[in-house]
UniProtKB/Swiss-Prot annotation:
Lineage, opening ranks: Bacteria, Pseudomonadati, Pseudomonadota, Gammaproteobacteria, Enterobacterales
NCBIfam families in the record: ade (TIGR01178), PRK10027.1 (NF007457)
Subunit structure: Homodimer.
Top-level taxon of origin: Bacteria
One record GO biological process: adenine catabolic process
Disulfide bridges in this chain: none
Stated name of the protein: Adenine deaminase
UniProt entry keywords in alphabetical sequence: Hydrolase, Manganese
InterPro entries tied to this protein: Adenine_deam (IPR006679), Adenine_deam_C (IPR026912), Amidohydro-rel (IPR006680), Metal-dep_hydrolase_composite (IPR011059), Metal_Hydrolase (IPR032466)
Annotated GO MF terms: adenine deaminase activity
Biological source species: Shigella flexneri serotype 5b (strain 8401)
PANTHER family, sorted: ADENINE DEAMINASE, N-ACETYLGLUCOSAMINE-6-PHOSPHATE DEACETYLASE
Length: 588
């Protein structure tokens, strides 16, 4: 918890203080009073009866003693339960394929009043210009959009080709920006553990802010060393005992439930009354279809309550107060005097049924957000421009030669998990010894014109056709999987023609595609339109076989070398446990 930095985010003038205190004392008229409401007590459990009094952006008072306080406007909550606005502790907005403006429109009416985002997806493509655009969006947003400064661009030096660098000098230029809360996930955990000076320089430079971690499956002395370097949290835990050990060693635990990585069921049993201040909720990557049909942080709270019997005050605590404290955002996370009036009114607290949302003391109207979306997006000056330098490809670019009797490495996918296994498969004149093996390739899309890196993929469920995308963590080269070289080439050429995007090919034809004109990562369409297009893509993909629930998001992580065990980057097959490149043929 970084109380030392709270002053950076809690902007309130002396005049605002005087006005707030006057309303708190009962000597002045409030702006809003929320009547007929019960407030969920996140500290003591139970509920607090009485109105909530708001002046400007802040809560002036709470409780029955304010029943007769005059106000410019009164809101009848109709017996609703009030809770603090929800906070996502770690996400990449770009992975929703929405702009920050569209993301706000889609999630703010669901109670998501604050996000802590790492824009390293667009920074890997466009460098500092991408970070600057996110900062502009954050400055004009109603939603509290805070930024962690991207620390690993690319994710691992020397393992992939990305579009831009983000130097320490450039990072430092953003450190004191009012929307910056710290240093984003330090993914090169072997480098930190081994004391690489370039990484320690980054940690030292952001030491007084929050230092985000990334260490899937790490334990023993290595975990101790990583934490000793100053890393404060991790969102990559996927096993119960792994999460427990990190909590024991002083790390804060971000429990992630995204579109590809589903760790809530594994980690929810850890949450209790005692450790909940050290537990937070995050999505990391969640697509617009899931947001529209299931929700965002509201969906995670619902599952904690309904499926894991987490007490109400604890479930809402880890969705708000715990995260606010961790990032030094002490003006957020509680419904109490002096706190920012980010309030979610729930008609049913157990089902997380959102009735109304207020942020910074103002009621949110979903229709107004939608009506203003285009104008607000234009005001942010999005960084348009084609970032795909790759020329069209042909089937011969994906030709691989196999020798009968030889054994070859296969990236073995685990549905709805980011980690993969490494297995081997024997080739014969009739093909591989398991029929789930298909082809995967990664094509550098920026400047070096590297030949496609090709490999084998198992367990994905692709029985026919091909899928291609320019969303491919973290360097966002073109990734394609397929059963035939011809269909792989067709899918790749479609996303090149679109200037970036997603594509499904089957029966030798493009069945569905989605252009992503901003950095090959984001659409400028509305959230509703984007959700419908995602629905069409998923429907087309399902015709190709029993794929993961979110095939494109899962596919996007097959090239991320900092998550074990076997991945494919633009430079070849990478062993994520040894942190070294390996060969397609098994020769050991």
């Amino acid at each position: 918890m970084n109380n030392s930095i709270n002053h950076k985010f809690h902007h309130i003038s002396r005049a605002e203080y005087q006005e707030l205190l006057a309303v708190s004392r009962g000597d002045a008229v409030a702006d809003y009073i929320i009547d007929n409401v019960s407030i969920l007590d996140l500290i003591n459990a139970g509920e607090i009866s009485g109105p909530i009094v708001i002046k400007g952006r802040y809560i002036a008072g709470v409780g029955a003693e304010y029943a007769d306080t005059p106000a410019l406007q009164r809101i009848d909550a109709r017996g609703a339960t009030a809770v603090p606005g929800f906070i996502d502790a770690h996400l990449h907005i770009e992975s929703s394929m929405m702009t920050p403006v569209t993301f706000e429109t889609a999630t703010l009416p669901r109670g998501l009043t604050t996000v802590i985002c790492d824009p390293h997806e667009i920074v890997n493509v466009m460098g500092e210009a991408g970070f600057a655009w996110f900062a502009r969006c954050a400055e004009q947003a109603r939603q509290n959009q805070y930024l962690q400064v991207s620390s690993c661009v690319p994710a691992l030096e020397g393992c992939d080709v990305n579009g831009a660098s983000f130097t320490l000098e450039q990072m430092l230029a953003w450190r004191d920006h009012p929307q910056v809360t710290g240093l984003a996930e330090m993914m090169d955990y072997p480098g930190v553990i081994n004391g690489q000076n370039a990484l320690l320089d980054k940690l030292d430079a952001f030491r007084y802010l929050t230092l985000d971690g990334h260490c899937p499956g790490l334990g023993g002395k290595e975990l101790n060393a990583y934490i000793a370097a100053g890393i404060e949290n991790c969102h990559e835990s996927y096993q119960l005992e792994e999460g427990r050990r990190k909590l024991q060693l002083g790390m804060s635990l971000m429990i992630r439930e995204g579109s590809a990585a589903s760790n809530l069921n594994a980690l929810a049993p850890l949450i209790n009354e005692f450790n909940s201040p050290q537990c937070m909720l995050c999505t990391d990557d969640r697509n617009p279809w899931e947001i529209a049909h299931e929700g965002h942080i509201d969906a995670l709270i619902r599952r904690l309550i309904e499926q894991h019997n987490v007490p109400l005050h604890v479930a809402y605590r880890v969705a708000s107060w715990s995260t606010a404290r961790h990032f030094g955002l002490n003006h957020l996370g509680l419904l109490a005097p002096g706190k920012q009036a980010d309030i979610v009114l729930l008609s049913d607290a157990r089902k997380v049924t959102v009735q109304q949302v207020l942020v910074k003391g103002e009621p949110i109207d979903a229709q107004t957000l939608q009506a203003e979306e285009s104008a607000r997006l234009a005001l942010s000056a999005p960084p348009y421009g084609n970032t795909i330098a790759r020329q069209p490809v042909s089937a011969s670019d994906f030709a691989l030669q196999f020798t009968p009797g030889k054994r070859y490495r296969v990236i073995d996918v685990i549905h709805n998990e980011l980690i993969t296994h490494s297995r081997s498969s024997v080739y014969s004149e009739n093909g591989f010894d398991r029929d789930d093996v298909c082809f995967i390739a990664v094509l550098e899309r920026y400047r070096q014109r590297l030949a496609p890196a090709c490999g084998l993929l198992g367990g994905f469920g692709l029985n026919e056709g091909a899928l291609a995308a320019t969303v491919s963590h973290d360097s966002h080269n073109i990734v394609v999987i397929g059963r035939s070289a011809e269909e792989m080439a067709l899918a790749v050429n479609q996303v090149i023609q679109d200037g970036g995007g997603l594509c499904v090919v089957r029966n030798g034809q493009v069945q569905s595609h989605l252009p992503l004109p901003i950095a090959g990562l984001m659409s400028t369409d509305t959230a509703q339109s984007l959700a419908e297009q995602i629905d069409a893509l998923k429907a087309a993909a399902r015709e190709c076989g029993p794929l993961p629930d979110e095939p494109f998001i899962q596919m996007a992580f097959l090239s991320l070398p900092v998550i074990p065990a076997l991945k494919l980057t633009s430079q070849g097959l990478f062993d994520g446990e040894k942190f070294a490149f390996t060969t397609l043929e098994v020769t050991e």
